[in-house]
């Protein structure tokens, strides 16, 4: 509660400028100002100004770039310069564990940001479905990994285990084939956050709104 008579001209000007955000303003008989507004609407409008959807587009694009870097640079160089199958498989294993610790987390955070942006838009009555689609598309890289890459991962881990135990070793040709197959599967996986980023960017630019 605040007495309007105690407000300076500058404060009164600010109060008038806030009328677009605070829809329900009541002047009481004793000169007090009571503001009644929906917390969720105020909060989501503030959040929209922070640009949650912009952050989601950036993190999704970063994830795509990191994954595509493996296909364009890292894996081809490893295959070209490695002559020992055990070394190639071990290097792939290090790459896998590094990505396993970071990639899914970035994907889930990006999906959560898109989901939050969708909720914020929904709360103020704006189109929100494309943000949810972008989030689901990005996170879909996780089940894709389980469904389509698990067999190749298992074969490579089995080969590494055999190398460490001194058992039957696979040939360089076979190790190159497995690592190359994983590389292409990973490239397809990178398309999920890429598609999410494209959808998000179209939403940010106002091209797609539904």
Swiss-Prot record:
GO BP terms in the entry: aflatoxin biosynthetic process
Localization, UniProt: Membrane
Catalytic activity: noranthrone + O2 = norsolorinic acid + H2O
UniProt-listed Enzyme Commission number(s): 1.13.12.20
Keyword Oxidoreductase in annotation: yes
GO MF annotations, alphabetized: monooxygenase activity
Keyword line: Membrane, Monooxygenase, Oxidoreductase, Transmembrane, Transmembrane helix
Membrane topology designation: Multi-pass membrane protein
Transmembrane helix listed as a keyword: yes
Cited InterPro entries: Anthrone_oxy
Pathway(s) served: Mycotoxin biosynthesis; aflatoxin biosynthesis
Gene ablation phenotype (knockout): Cells accumulate excess amounts of norsolorinic acid (NA) and a small amount of norsolorinic acid anthrone (NAA).
GO CC list: membrane
Regions crossing the membrane: 59-79, 105-125, 131-151, 188-208
Cited function: Monooxygenase that converts norsolorinic acid anthrone to norsolorinic acid during aflatoxin biosynthesis.
Family: Belongs to the anthrone oxygenase family.
Name under which the protein is recorded: Noranthrone monooxygenase
Lineage start: Eukaryota, Fungi, Dikarya, Ascomycota, Pezizomycotina
């Amino acid at each position: 509660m605040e007495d309007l008579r105690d407000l300076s001209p500058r404060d009164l000007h600010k109060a008038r400028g806030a009328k677009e955000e605070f829809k329900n303003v009541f002047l009481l008989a004793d000169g007090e100002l009571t503001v009644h507004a929906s917390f969720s609407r105020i909060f989501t409008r503030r959040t929209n100004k922070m640009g949650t959807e912009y952050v989601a587009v950036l993190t999704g694009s970063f994830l795509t770039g990191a994954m595509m870097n493996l296909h364009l640079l890292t894996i081809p160089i490893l295959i070209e310069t490695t002559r020992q199958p055990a070394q190639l498989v071990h290097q792939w294993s290090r790459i896998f564990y590094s990505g396993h610790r970071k990639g899914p987390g970035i994907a889930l955070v990006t999906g959560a940001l898109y989901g939050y942006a969708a909720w914020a838009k929904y709360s103020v009555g704006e189109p929100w479905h494309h943000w949810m689609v972008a989030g689901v598309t990005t996170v879909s890289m996780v089940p894709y990994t389980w469904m389509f890459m698990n067999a190749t991962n298992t074969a490579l881990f089995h080969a590494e285990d055999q190398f460490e135990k001194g058992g039957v070793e696979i040939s360089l040709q076979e190790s190159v084939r497995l690592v190359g197959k994983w590389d292409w599967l990973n490239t397809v996986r990178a398309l999920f956050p890429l598609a999410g980023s494209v959808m998000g960017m179209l939403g940010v630019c106002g091209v797609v709104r539904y």
